[in-house]
Amino acid sequence: MGKRAAHIGLRALADLATPMAVRVAATLRVADHIAAGHRTAAEIASAAGAHADSLDRLLRHLVAVGLFTRDGQGVYGLTEFGEQLRDDHAAGKRKWLDMNSAVGRGDLGFVELAHSIRTGQPAYPVRYGTSFWEDLGSDPVLSASFDTLMSHHLELDYTGIAAKYDWAALGHVVDVGGGSGGLLSALLTAHEDLSGTVLDLQGPASAAHRRFLDTGLSGRAQVVVGSFFDPLPAGAGGYVLSAVLHDWDDLSAVAILRRCAEAAGSGGVVLVIEAVAGDEHAGTGMDLRMLTYFGGKERSLAELGELAAQAGLAVRAAHPISYVSIVEMTAL
């Protein structure tokens, strides 16, 4: 590769124009407006509440990268690639990029990544003046968007999670920080002899309650409003932490595991479900995202074992399932 080619390649790799243009288009729902028949820059701008000339410039760039088409009369259309920006597309990607959603907003914290690298602290408070969790706690709409996105993300693994482990043998499980109840619903549907509880804060707990009523699972599914930093309902066969620990620094992660260990006692099991660093699916980009959002991290099995030991637990087994693993822990 020549010097100029290498220079252009590095610039392209670091360029912010395209990622931000895509996110702005997602936030303004440009693809939906085009699909609805608004085809010129002026029409799309009117529907989206945008400045027509500026939007036209953004659209021209997204034509250049293959998301949209533009004919000689300035009429825009969607490419197959650009269809993914529609809100109703099966991939569900638009909401992740929408800068008004919890994740789209959180990703903008990458602008402050240097702070995280220098200090080891999350970048989110530097950008927004408050922590990610405090932000969600003060904004029900933002909180609901986070719960929806997380549920959609984990649904890809629900079938494998339900099939890969002998959940029925546990009798009753507590999904700690279980959000709107998607995982527990999948487990109860797959295992008719299993019952369970979702424990989470008021917003997601209310959503879980509605889900269980709607799906006819309320006879076997309970909801408890609470925090995983406080004592948990004791005596269940299993305590599930699905995509929880990577959101927290080591001290907080140990505190969460310790609460689970206390509730599980000598006869229960703690099941950590998340990507394990070192696996092919544990992305380095996601690891940086955990750092910038929360000061959290993607951990290796050895690192999870170290945290478990501090909480009075030991890793007994790990069951890989597509993009995540079920890491089984019991009392030392």
UniProtKB/Swiss-Prot annotation:
Active site annotation, chain numbering:
246
Instruction: Output the Gene Ontology terms for molecular function.
Output: O-methyltransferase activity; protein dimerization activity
Q: Which residues form the signal peptide?
A: none
Q: Is Transport tagged as a keyword?
A: no
Q: What is the effect of changing residue 11 to A/W?
A: Still able to methylate naphthoate. Induces a doubling of KM
Q: How does activity depend on pH?
A: Optimum pH is 6.0.
Give the superkingdom in one word: Bacteria
- Which InterPro entries does the record match to this protein? COMT-like (IPR016461), O_MeTrfase_dom (IPR001077), Plant_O-MeTrfase_dimerisation (IPR012967), SAM-dependent_MTases_sf (IPR029063), WH-like_DNA-bd_sf (IPR036388), WH_DNA-bd_sf (IPR036390)
Q: In which pathway does it act?
A: Antibiotic biosynthesis
Q: Which UniProt keywords apply?
A: Antibiotic biosynthesis, Methyltransferase, S-adenosyl-L-methionine, Transferase
Answer yes or no on keyword Transferase: yes
Q: What are the binding positions for substrate in this chain?
A: 11, 247
Q: Which reaction does it catalyse?
A: 2,7-dihydroxy-5-methyl-1-naphthoate + S-adenosyl-L-methionine = 2-hydroxy-7-methoxy-5-methyl-1-naphthoate + S-adenosyl-L-homocysteine + H(+)
Q: Which SUPFAM superfamilies match?
A: S-adenosyl-L-methionine-dependent methyltransferases, Winged helix' DNA-binding domain
The UniProt record lists the EC number as 2.1.1.303
Q: What processes in GO biological process is this protein linked to?
A: antibiotic biosynthetic process; methylation
- Positions with a binding annotation for S-adenosyl-L-methionine: 133, 153, 175-179, 200, 227-228, 242-243
Q: Please report which protein family the annotation says this sequence is part of.
A: Belongs to the class I-like SAM-binding methyltransferase superfamily. Cation-independent O-methyltransferase family.
Function description: S-adenosyl-L-methionine-dependent O-methyltransferase that catalyzes regiospecific methylation at the 7-hydroxy group of 2,7-dihydroxy-5-methyl-1-naphthoate in the biosynthesis of the naphthoate moiety of the neocarzinostatin chromophore. Also recognizes other dihydroxynaphthoate as substrates and catalyzes their regiospecific O-methylation. The carboxylate and its ortho-hydroxy groups of the substrate appear to be crucial for NcsB1 substrate recognition and binding, and O-methylation takes place only at the free hydroxy group of these dihydroxynaphthoic acids.
What's this protein's name?
A: 2,7-dihydroxy-5-methyl-1-naphthoate 7-O-methyltransferase
- Give me the gene this protein comes from: ncsB1
